[in-house]
A protein has these predicted regions:
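Auxiliary N-terminal substrate/complex-recognition segments of SAM-dependent methyltransferases
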Residues: 1-215
Length: 215
C-alpha cells in the first residue's frame, strides 16, 4: 500500500534545498503500513500531509502544505514519478491558509524535531532554508507544539487521526499525557533506533477513531 517513494528524478542539487527521505521517513511509512488495512477500510475523505511528505494516497481529497516552495515543486514531480494523483499543494505553515477546521480525517506530520536554539529555528523558517526541515527549537518541539495546540480545531470531531513522528528528546510520553488530558487517545505505534536517534511514531486520535483503528 505504501511503498518507499521513488525519488530517483531528484538530484543532489535538489537535496540542497529539499529534505531527502531518511530513517524518519521510513518509520512513518512502516507505521502507516502496519495500519494499512484499518486505514483502507476507514476510507478517510480528507488527508493532510504537513512538511516532509511520504506521498500517501488513500483519501479522496489530499492536501500537502510546506513553507518551502522548492519542496512543493519537488513533491509535485515526485507524485508524478510515482504514478500518483496530484494533491492540492499549498505553501503555508501548518494549516494557516486552509479553511478545513474540524474536517481533516487523516493528518500526517513528520516535523522538524531536532533540538536547536530558538534563534536557529526562527532563522531557518524565515529564510526557508533546508534546515527548516529539521531545526525544531526548544526540545525540538516549537512547531509540533503549535500544531498540538490547534489539534482540536483541526481534526474531525469523530474521525480525526494524527500520525506524528517524534524522537526521545521530544519526550513522547509527555506528548501522550498532554493529548490524553485534552480528550484524545494517544499511543506509540512504532519505535526504532536509527543511529543516535530514538524515533517514535505516535497515533493521536479522537476516541471513536481510536476504537476503529484498534479493531
Amino acid at each position: 500500500m505504501l511503498p518507499t517513494p521513488d525519488v530517483s528524478h531528484l538530484t543532489s542539487k535538489d537535496f540542497n534545498h529539499v529534505y531527502e527521505p531518511a530513517e524518519d521517513t521510513f518509520i512513518l511509512l512502516d507505521a502507516l503500513e502496519a495500519d494499512a488495512k484499518q486505514l483502507v477500510d476507514y476510507r478517510p475523505f480528507i488527508c493532510l500531509e504537513i512538511g516532509k511528505q511520504i506521498f500517501c494516497s488513500i483519501s479522496t481529497l489530499h492536501f500537502c502544505t510546506d513553507i518551502n516552495p522548492l519542496a512543493l515543486r519537488a513533491s509535485a514531480f515526485t507524485f508524478t514519478q510515482n504514478g500518483l494523483p496530484q494533491p492540492n499543494l499549498i505553501q503555508t505553515s501548518l494549516v494557516e491558509c486552509l479553511r478545513l477546521g474540524k474536517m481533516i480525517e487523516l493528518l500526517i506530520f513528520n516535523p522538524p524535531y531536532v533540538e536547536t536554539e530558538d534563534e536557529e529555528y526562527a532563522d531557518a523558517r524565515g529564510d526557508l532554508t533546508i534546515s527548516a526541515s529539521w531545526a525544531g527549537g526548544s526540545d525540538g518541539m516549537k512547531l509540533t507544539n503549535q500544531l498540538l495546540d490547534k489539534l482540536d480545531c483541526i481534526l474531525h470531531p469523530q474521525r480525526g487521526i494524527l500520525y506524528l513522528v517524534a524522537v526521545k528528546e521530544n519526550k513522547p510520553d509527555e506528548i501522550i499525557k498532554r493529548m490524553v488530558d485534552s480528550g484524545f487517545k494517544a499511543v506509540v505505534v512504532l519505535k526504532r533506533r536509527a543511529g543516535r536517534e530514538h524515533l517514535h511514531v505516535l497515533r493521536i486520535s479522537r476516541p471513536s477513531a481510536h476504537a476503529v483503528m484498534c479493531n
